[in-house]
């Protein structure tokens, strides 16, 4: 499981941005974490040059930016007073940068944040279900990013969907999914796609007495076991259920243990991203997915398929990026 002790909330002070405040507070309350806010003031290169050419009395670096930063910090502190409990309240940071998404991702990495919680869209509402800044943060951040909207209640979620092609990289999302599941007492669904040309799990040992779905299910459980062992996640075991496609994780914590229901959904669809969209819309409160898959599950989330999934999902998404060493070794 992945520990959550520091949460970063980027804000542009829009009504949409406020959606992230309640979610961050709820997660912090359940996990015993602190919540930091960040606002990025974009550099105004053209305006800076214009003032210099005009010999204007105002100076951006010495006057305009410091005033704007002071006002932004005040607004963040006011928002934190309204939405964040004293025991989970962290710091309010305002930075000046040419690229807000890069600044957010770098700040989260440099300050050891465990999770970024942000609204799907900010001031610049787009026809896409996730705005350009949010998508750029998802793409650039090495820290998991949880994008929320008004459709998800901050008080709880019950169904977590984890798309997987059975590869270790796609299972990278599991520790964060397990953390959410234990915090909210939610269930986890592993969603696997059989595209037209088949499944990457078709090559595993097959039992001719079982259906394609049952063989894929058994192969998926086997690979999941291998992933837990390879990653040294010794406190999580799979308890196989009596009913097909329904099992449990047993999560041990010192002398106690908790159980998380897991369900495996296997569907034959035309494309992975369409299958994910449709299933998530009907069955999931949040989709937790790795930012890279393998084989036929497509360039999940580091290519065109990723962008289609991230932009078009109407369900909140939490993205997790694998370690760079694992990506390069793929």
Regions found by a protein language model. Give the residues of each.
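Structural beta-alpha unit
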Residues: 1-3, 16, 42-45, 70, ...
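Small/aliphatic-rich secondary-structure junction motif
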Residues: 1-59, 87, 159-217, 225, ...
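Short, ordered loop/turn segments at secondary-structure junctions
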Residues: 40, 121, 150-152, 193, ...
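Short, surface-exposed alpha-helical segments at coil->helix boundaries
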Residues: 62-78, 214-225
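Short beta-strand elements of ligand-binding domains
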Residues: 117-120, 144-150, 317-321
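Glycine-rich, Arg-bearing micro-motifs that act as flexible, cationic patches
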Residues: 118-136, 268-274, 289-312, 326-327
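Short, structured interface segments
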Residues: 132-152
